[in-house]
Amino acid sequence: MLIIAALYLALNAALLTFGKALIISQIEKNLYAKASLEKVTFGLPLSINIDKLSIEGLFKADSVLVSPSIMGFLAGRIILNSLKIARPEITLTRDKDDKFNLPRIESKGKAPPILLAGLKIQDGKLIFLDKKIDPDGYRVVVNDINVDIAKVAFPPTSLYTNFKASAIFVNGASSPAGKAIASGWIDFGPKDMDGKFELKDVEAVVLSPYYQNIIPAKKLHSGKLNFIADLKAKNNDLLVKCHLEFSDIVYGKEEGEGKNSVSDLFSDALGIFSDASGRVTFDFSFNTKLDKPRVDLINLKGTIAQAAAQNIASQPPENVIEKVKETAKKFKEFGKSLKDIFKKEE
């Protein structure tokens, strides 16, 4: 026991003396970003604790705990039994050229792969600034990020991994604006998967620029977004089945807008696709690869358009005819009012 205690004290002394400078220098050397941390300590049975880690413009966390595997080290592999990150805050930026502020890690020589057996994120935060959508940076904030990813312990060679995650969207008033949830399992050996991703009761305005081809973002005042993606993979072939639903959509009127305004027309046009309860739903699916997932946007737009057509086809014909007639009438009245305005100006 005395030997273990002495070794523990020696390791902590070494980390306090050299660990901080070593970790900072490695981060700055590999990520090309300014880094800082408060202290580094050694814990039992075997863990390295980093307090107040910060990487300029990208990441900061109250604490990072790393538990390496001794057996993996003896086998010549870098295996982390667990990585726990408490209260991380990530700032992700996309520029006008669709490039992100993620650092490029240059591989020098053939470095051994790092295998992660477990990851836990507690009370995280993501700030996404999208300068491709808005030159000033459209801001999406996600709070209360909690992630739990764990590889099964037996058999040791298995790559079967369970995962679950949750997060809360935040609106412009810093209030909760919906929830994101993910759960399931993935086996990296045969490349199989069974999982689900959900957006529940998200305020439609929060993500409005990303579906403005469906709902005009500038006119959207309020509404709810729900989305479910069922992900199933077998031998690397991944099928994603999606259900997208908008409800309680309300368009705000700009100053001076009255009856048969542009806002009303947007609402009526969208209403053609809605069911009896006023919900607009799209059911669609696409195929990709589990190890290299990609989405063909052109094909996806076509798939969504087909889903919209099916949505109309599933409604009673008399309902659709009545909706189209009413909307066409309002467009005609709106066009007449524009014509009258231009006549007055002449």
PLM-predicted stretches and their roles:
Residues 1, 185, 220, 224, ...:
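Extended terminal
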Residues 1-32, 317-331:
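N-terminal type II signal-anchor transmembrane helix
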Residues 41-98, 105-130, 232:
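Flexible beta-edge/linker motif
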Residues 43, 69-73, 93, 152, ...:
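Short beta-strand micro-motifs enriched in acidic
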Residues 105-211, 286-288, 293, 298-318:
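Elongated, acidic membrane-bridging lipid-handling scaffolds
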